[in-house]
Amino acid sequence: DVVVYDNLASSSLLNEVRDDAELIYAGKRSSNHHLKQYETNELLVKLALEGKNVVRLKGGDPYIFGRGGEEGQELREAGVDFEIVPGISSSYSVPAYCGIPVTHRDFASSFHVITGHEGNHKNGVSVLNYETLAKEEGTLIFLMGLKNLPNIVASLMENGKDPATPVGVLQEGTTARQRVATGTLADIVEVVEREGIKT
């Protein structure tokens, strides 16, 4: 009956929705939120309690930085039964689509997925342990980190990460608007600026 979709959901999927279904946009982009998260949570509960069949369409996996946990918690507390259809996380699917392996037996035997925009700073100080992250030999994947790229880069180098470490910045992966910039930890901020990649 209703599809509540977000910014990262593929528009081609919306073309498959029944003609009589209601489409509600609940997207978030950087600091521009069409609906605040609590409003999305309340909307999902309201629609379900009205007896409507509701699809919450998200890009990637809803439980990996997708706020699916928050939405599911709200539905559970309201007594609403729901089903999760796991998605394929952009943390590994987008690099693969771009030809960048996140693991390789000669270079990286692990990968680590990290938020690129923390919502839980303590007095303006990052709660991420950049000292530990800088020592990791595996691939570091920062999701939604473009706006904070200069801070991420500086924090890693200040804590000992080799400035020659290869870096890729991937934007809107697997879509017609996909952008890829590659460089090193030392120059990736300049490369991204030169390529005109912005949030």
Model-predicted segments: where are they?
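Class I S-adenosyl-L-methionine
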Residues: 1-88, 93, 189
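A contiguous loop/helix-start segment that scaffolds small-molecule binding in enzyme catalytic cores
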Residues: 2, 39, 49-54, 110, ...
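Short secondary-structure boundary/capping segments
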Residues: 14-15, 46, 103-104, 131-132, ...
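Acidic/glycine-enriched edge-of-secondary-structure segments
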Residues: 22-36, 107-117, 141
